[in-house]
């Protein structure tokens, strides 16, 4: 659990129901069990149970003489619910006596019982949340003028700057927010106005408004969008943020408005910044924060392309117990982010810190490819499914063709590591996904490989063909030709080949294969003399004739070692050549080539 809250006055709105003191739990159960109808345990069950079948199970416990309220709260507590969640339900029930028990037990939850008797639904919840003490951090109590966070912004400035929220200043809209742009004191801000069109929907979405406000007030990080101010004036609830001129990461990846594509060094910087923010939220005390809505559209970029994580309406708190997850009810708002959510969330509503890791893995894939999460062609396939299928069937190199073509290519080592990391983050099983600590370390170590001009070849298959200019200047560069032409050497190269074939000491070559060469039968002294007089040369000059060009699918140079095919007076003598490359040699491929 998050901590021991047995002492009076140690409760807060974030205290888990598991940590509810036994004495308080007993009093609460006695009050609710003694009431009938909407104020009793049945009224509580109507709001906590997902189906009437669950209510029937509670009735069986009651028939056995057990407390229906205790069973309800125990089941609800397994979803990581807090005292603040319980207070909201009790307020909906209108159960002032139960609220009085909780608020009198932990005075820090509310300044007085009067706060639950005045005003409407939003005002009650706002006062309830605005006086919370978590980890010795006090959220200041709001007033009619709202809260100013190191800012001189007033609500009148908002009204005048937006002309009373005129549509001309509307720059975005979501399910529960409208976003306006406003100029105040030569500074630009974004105003998120809470929608209150319908009373029932207002009550439904109010908790999401509080969730975002709570996270922004309690937790601060350079890569989390800071809150400039918030107001609750005349039933207008709004959050004020600094305006991010470079928009969202999604818009920049898609080059919306014909903007220039992001170079690779900015992209890796964005990934590192967001991973730091997520890592901070997952490890913050007293309980970790699950974002629940990580996407490229929820990552904002400032003037210097520094990333800012935003949108915490779906955020949930959980204790730091290992392998713990909570179950939530999916809403229509979360369905917009389903492409970023793992299967355990879509099917069962399970939410954990590994959910954020999965979502971040999808963002990495977007950054690498510049593609949308769902590809229109072919057949609206998910980007994640396409890349993982390629990795499993054709290997990691097959994904490199999906790198964003709008920017110059990056080193293979850099992109391969990021594709591998994205695949691990977006694993189907949550246990196989890395922690954000591991993700952050991998990103920081990968950043250094971006500044290497190219990757050193590890085998002949990774060796790049030289340019034509290089071929003209170096006559000994191999040239491609058929096997049948290997014995028809050019006159100018015949002597050079004979000299090199008579060298006694083995060469050091970059090839991974071990070759056997036929040597001319000559007196030992003559061979030694020729070997000493021959000048040193590179491995390419030593092994390949002039007319063989290395390709990406280069096979071993075949040399006839059959004694019967040698000229009279020569014997077949073989010796291996040392290799400086540690890559594996495909014997199956060599045998197949030999048969041809």
UniProtKB/Swiss-Prot annotation:
Tissues in which the UniProt entry reports expression: Expressed in eosinophils, dendritic cells and/or monocytes (at protein level). Expressed predominantly in peripheral blood lymphocytes.
Source organism per UniProt: Homo sapiens (Human)
Disease implicated: Asthma-related traits 5: Asthma-related traits include clinical symptoms of asthma, such as coughing, wheezing, dyspnea, bronchial hyperresponsiveness as assessed by methacholine challenge test, serum IgE levels, atopy and atopic dermatitis.
Consequence recorded when altering residue 467 to A: No effect on the interaction with PIN1
Gene Ontology cellular component list: cytoplasm; nucleus; plasma membrane
Record-given protein name: Interleukin-1 receptor-associated kinase 3
InterPro entries: DEATH-like_dom_sf, Death_dom, IRAK3_death, IRAK3_PK, Kinase-like_dom_sf, Prot_kinase_dom
Subcellular location, principal: cytoplasm
Effect after changing residue 22 to L: Probable risk factor for ASRT5
Domain of life: Eukaryota
Annotated positions for site Cis/trans isomerization of proline peptide bond: 110-111
Residue span(s) of domain Death: 41-106
SUPFAM superfamilies (alphabetical): DEATH domain, Protein kinase-like (PK-like)
Binding-site list for ATP: 171-179, 192, 295-298, 311
Family label: Belongs to the protein kinase superfamily. TKL Ser/Thr protein kinase family. Pelle subfamily.
Compartments it resides in: Cytoplasm; Nucleus
Effect of residue 400 to V: Probable risk factor for ASRT5
Keyword terms of this UniProt record: Asthma, ATP-binding, Cytoplasm, Disulfide bond, Nucleotide-binding, Nucleus, Phosphoprotein
Known outcome of mutating residue 214 to L: Enhances dimerization
């Amino acid at each position: 659990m998050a901590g021991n809250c047995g002492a009076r006055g140690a409760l807060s709105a974030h205290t888990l129901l598991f940590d509810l003191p036994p004495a308080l739990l007993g009093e609460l159960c006695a009050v609710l069990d003694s009431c009938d109808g909407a104020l009793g345990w049945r009224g509580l069950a109507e709001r906590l149970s997902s189906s009437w079948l669950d209510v029937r199970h509670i009735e069986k416990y009651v028939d056995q003489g057990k407390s229906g309220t205790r069973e309800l709260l125990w089941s609800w507590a397994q979803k990581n619910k807090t005292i603040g969640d319980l207070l909201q339900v009790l307020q909906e029930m209108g159960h002032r006596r139960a609220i009085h028990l909780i608020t009198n037990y932990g005075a820090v939850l509310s300044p007085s019982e009067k706060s639950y008797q005045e005003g409407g639904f939003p005002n009650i919840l706002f006062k309830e949340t605005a006086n919370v003490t978590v980890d010795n951090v006090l959220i200041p109590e709001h007033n009619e003028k709202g809260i100013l966070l190191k800012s001189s912004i007033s609500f009148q400035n908002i009204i005048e700057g937006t002309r009373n929220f005129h549509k001309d200043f509307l720059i975005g809209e979501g399910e529960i927010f409208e976003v306006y742009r406003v100029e105040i004191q030569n500074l630009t801000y974004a105003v998120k106005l809470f929608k209150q069109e319908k009373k029932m929907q207002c009550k439904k979405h109010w908790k999401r408004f509080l969730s975002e406000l709570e996270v922004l007030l309690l937790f601060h990080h350079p890569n989390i969008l800071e809150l400039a101010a918030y107001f609750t004036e005349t039933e207008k609830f709004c959050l004020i943020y600094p305006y991010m001129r470079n928009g969202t990461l999604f818009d920049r990846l898609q080059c919306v408005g014909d903007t220039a594509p992001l170079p690779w060094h900015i992209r890796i910087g964005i990934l590192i910044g967001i991973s730091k923010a997520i890592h901070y939220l997952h490890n913050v005390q007293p309980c970790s924060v699950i974002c629940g809505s990580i996407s490229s559209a929820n990552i904002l970029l400032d003037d210097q392309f520094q990333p800012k994580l935003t949108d915490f309406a779906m955020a949930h708190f959980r204790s730091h117990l290992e392998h713990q997850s909570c179950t939530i009810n999916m809403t229509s708002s979360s369905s917009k982010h389903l492409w970023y959510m793992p299967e355990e969330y879509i099917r069962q509503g399970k939410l954990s810190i590994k959910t954020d890791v999965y979502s971040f893995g999808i963002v990495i894939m977007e950054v690498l490819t510049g593609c949308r999460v769902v590809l229109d062609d072919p057949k609206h396939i998910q980007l994640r499914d396409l890349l993982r299928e390629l990795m499993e069937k054709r290997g990691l190199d097959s994904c490199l063709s999906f790198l964003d073509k709008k920017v110059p290519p990056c080193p293979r080592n850099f992109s391969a590591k990021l594709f591998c990391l994205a695949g691990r983050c977006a694993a189907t099983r949550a246990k196989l996904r890395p922690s954000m600590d591991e993700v952050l370390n991998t990103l920081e170590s990968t950043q250094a490989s971006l500044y290497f001009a190219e990757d050193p070849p590890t085998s002949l298959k990774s060796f790049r063909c030289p340019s034509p200019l290089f071929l003209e200047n170096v006559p000994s560069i191999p040239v491609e030709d058929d096997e049948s032409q290997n014995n028809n050497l050019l006159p100018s190269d015949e002597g050079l080949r004979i000299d090199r074939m008579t060298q006694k000491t083995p060469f050091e070559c970059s090839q991974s294969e071990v070759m056997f060469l036929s040597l001319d039968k000559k007196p030992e002294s003559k061979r030694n003399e020729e070997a000493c007089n021959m000048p040193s040369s590179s491995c390419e000059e030593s092994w390949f004739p002039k007319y063989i060009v290395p390709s990406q699918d280069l096979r071993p140079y075949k040399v006839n070692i059959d004694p019967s095919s040698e000229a009279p007076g020569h014997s077949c003598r073989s010796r291996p050549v040392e290799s400086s490359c540690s890559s594996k040699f495909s014997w199956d491929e060599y045998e197949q080539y030999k048969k041809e």
